[in-house]
Amino acid sequence: MRLSRYFLPILKENPKEAEIVSHRLMLRSGMIRQQSAGIYSWLPIGLKVLNKVCTIIREEQNRAGANEILMPTIQSADLWRESGRYDAYGKEMLRIQDRQEREMLFGPTNEEMVTDIFRSYVRSYKDLPLNLYHIQWKFRDEVRPRFGVMRSREFLMKDAYSFDLDYEGAKMAYYRMFVSYLRTFARVGLQAIPMRADTGPIGGDLSHEFIILAETGESQVYCDRAYLDLAVPGADTDFRNDAQLTDIVTRWTTPYAATDEMHDEADWAKVKPESQVSARGIEVGHIFHFGTKYSEPMGAKVQGPDGKEHLVSMGSYGIGPSRLVAAAIEASHDDAGIIWPKAIAPFGAGIVNMKPGDEGCDGVSEKLYEALTNAGVDPLLDDKDERPGAKFATMDLIGLPTQVIVGPRGVAAGEVEVKDRKMGERQSLGIEAAINMLTAQA
């Protein structure tokens, strides 16, 4: 993409309404625009990042055996009355009527609808286990939306729902999602720590929040430093191997880790002082086993191997892709702007033509652009006639992993300057060497 043809509305000043780093940088870098309280438009560069996050989520959900569907945002109030949640749910749920005065709602979550889909088609234990997921925009009328897309009223959510014959099957479904989440966050470029979470009235031990450590986190968290050294499950993980999954979950839940709500001082005291990490954290995912909470009132049953009907045991698993984008910025930025992990960077590299109109600079910039595009690097070519300082500031702000600087002096020497955004290191390379280095990283 050429910057002269790209819609990138950069803000030079920090927006007054932005309270945290991610909100400020997303507005300044032209990723989003606020349309009303807690509701945002995603602009081209922001949407590219969001789509890359969703691609990784999809790949890992599919790898774990989940099936993607897409449910409507508008739901019937009747389904929610079946589960008993329609009257119990607070003002966060937006309730509407259609022209026939039928009561509808803008879905804040999808347990009822996915249970209705399941009970309409699945009759036998032979069709289990089953996991259905979708990625969908949701709306919750937050009393005080703040922090940009971190706590917005409209947000993108990946929610998955598992169906199993009994608790043992549901536990393994939970383990599959647990491991899938570890891989998802690692691929996005984040170090997420699973922490014990409140299970509510259902009880049990199957509820975890996935937390990344960040100074601007909303909650206080406590964990053993051992988590920082744990190896994330590899791409060769066999999601059909219950023993392997159990071993991974055991390793990732044995060291102490808890949010402030679940913090236990007695257990915390057992962690060596030098291994204690007390910090702020951001929730980026939540998985939860809720048994027959929805299958019982909604009659979601299957015939078991004993010939009898059994209520299915269910779980839900959520990741907010839009929130995850903001969390990645909170975890990786500096005073100049965003530092994107390579996997979700909007472009693979930025080419900075220091002197558009100069035959040499234009020629080298075009050669780099064509070579990197053909190699799948997806570069952004800054071909605009602006001051060098403004060009550098824009590239640092939008956080592309690598910048290739093309100037008259370097071109005369047959070289370009390559800058690593994260490390700040610069090196002069021959043009072919620069192309080879960047294509090798693609």
From Swiss-Prot:
EC id: 6.1.1.15
Domain of life: Bacteria
Database matches in InterPro entries: aa-tRNA-synt_IIb, aa-tRNA-synth_II, aa-tRNA-synth_II/BPL/LPL, Anticodon-bd, Anticodon-bd_dom_sf, Pro-tRNA-ligase_IIa, Pro-tRNA-synth_IIa_bac-type, Pro-tRNA_synthetase
Gene Ontology terms: cellular component: cytosol
Keyword ATP-binding in record: yes
Reaction catalysis annotation: tRNA(Pro) + L-proline + ATP = L-prolyl-tRNA(Pro) + AMP + diphosphate
Family matches, as PROSITE patterns: AA_TRNA_LIGASE_II
Predominant place of localization: cytoplasm
GO MF term (any one): proline-tRNA ligase activity
Residues of the signal peptide: none
Biological process terms in GO annotation: prolyl-tRNA aminoacylation
Localization per record: Cytoplasm
Described function: Catalyzes the attachment of proline to tRNA(Pro) in a two-step reaction: proline is first activated by ATP to form Pro-AMP and then transferred to the acceptor end of tRNA(Pro).
Oligomeric and partner information: Homodimer.
Family, similarity comment: Belongs to the class-II aminoacyl-tRNA synthetase family. ProS type 2 subfamily.
Protein name: Proline--tRNA ligase
Origin organism lineage: Bacteria, Pseudomonadati, Pseudomonadota, Alphaproteobacteria, Hyphomicrobiales
